[in-house]
Amino acid sequence: MKTAVEELSPTRVKLTIEVPFEELDHAFDVTYKSLAKQVRIKGFRPGKAPAKLIDRYVGRGAVLTQAVNHAVPELYSEAVSKEEVPVLGPPEVEITRLEDGKELAFTAEVDVRPKFEVTDYEGIEVTVDDAEVTEEQVNERLEALRQRFATLIGVDRPAEQGDHVSIDLSASVDGKKLEDAQASGVSYEIGAGTLLQGLDEAIIGLSAGESATFTTTLVGGEHKGREADVTVTVHSVKLKELPELDDEFARLASEFDTIEELRASEAERLGELLRAQQLRQARDRVLEKLVDSIDIPLPESVIKQEADRRRELLDRQLSQSGLSKEAYLEAQEKTEEEFEAELTENATRAVKTGFVLDQLASQENLTASNEELTQYVVEQAQSMGISPDQLFQSLMQANQLQLVYVEVLRAKALDLVVSKAKITDESGNTIEPPTPVHTETITVASGDEETEESAAEQGETEK
């Protein structure tokens, strides 16, 4: 087999492959065996007819076509391996010469990874947010804890802002009750703003057993967007009573005996949280600077494939949530054109990020151990709420275990860059690079989200 490679662009090549007929013997053997089982020739049992009779019965052209179709994928793979071509996606194949008994020649155009080196990746400078814990932040955490331990006490008075009420809602349009816009026994906190516009104003001042009607725009269901008259009936009014921030509360809400111990614990936890956020921010900003510093050509077909994958994933998520594409765009305050432009931009960024990290991992001869691969699967499964075995089986079934290896290598490549970066906070303090987190997911064009999503769906089904 003769092979040659022609560079059509920095991201696309054409392989020319010439094969003498004697190297197609295996393909013809497979073809004849397959056809012998399909045809019925008088005097021969199924599968036993000789090749010459099969040629005569089905036509030599049909035999050649089937043999070539069987041979080309394997010959293409051999040529790619021989020429060490870093292919991306399927090729466009064209048979250029087929001389029976002499030679088969064909070309294969295919996208390839761009050739480049990752240089000057040491000493990248980034600034991250301060991780200083303020008294106000600690107070906010304690207030949230108080809210969790609040009690509701029934009161015999008109409803006020912040009260909890039990209500019925009934909507009508032009005096006709809407059957799909009725609700009973709804618990609602006045001021939350989670239901209908105008509801808070209608409830305030009502006592248990009283009703009021207001006009609003429906936000869901068959009549979404229509103006309707809504009657709200209050069944009960309850006052939220918060516990005092004292030692008794500390013993109730924690393992501590005093409020000062609880306050110190919350400050420590908040500090750990802020430091973790700070280190994640450092990784994100180092990666952003690294990718921005490198200019490489990107295959349009790969960008399109990544954009299509992201679009299909969003469509499935919207379908599962019952939200239309139009409603999603409205919530995001984007037009279809703006959505598509952002989608393409993000896909382009993801493809480029993947190329950069893959190249760095290759340059530095990074590898991933079985322990690291297992840790990745375990932590990803935990974040998805399924068992590691479920995720592993899904990856196996989708033939995507190689993607786990790629993800771990990419994370290790980023760890390497971050470990050599110069990180300071906004106050000018030097931040030590984070401990390598090989299993942390990086937003690149890896294509594994679909498998992980299907694994998560399987886990929900089995619960």
From Swiss-Prot:
**What residues does the PPIase FKBP-type domain cover?**
162-243
Domain of life the protein comes from: Bacteria
The record's Gene Ontology biological-process terms are: 'de novo' cotranslational protein folding; cell division; chaperone-mediated protein folding; protein transport; protein unfolding
EC number(s) on file: 5.2.1.8
Region Disordered, residue ranges: 427-463
Tell me the PANTHER family matching this sequence. TRIGGER FACTOR CHAPERONE AND PEPTIDYL-PROLYL CIS/TRANS ISOMERASE, TRIGGER FACTOR-LIKE PROTEIN TIG, CHLOROPLASTIC
Q: What protein name applies here?
A: Trigger factor
Q: Which gene encodes it?
A: tig
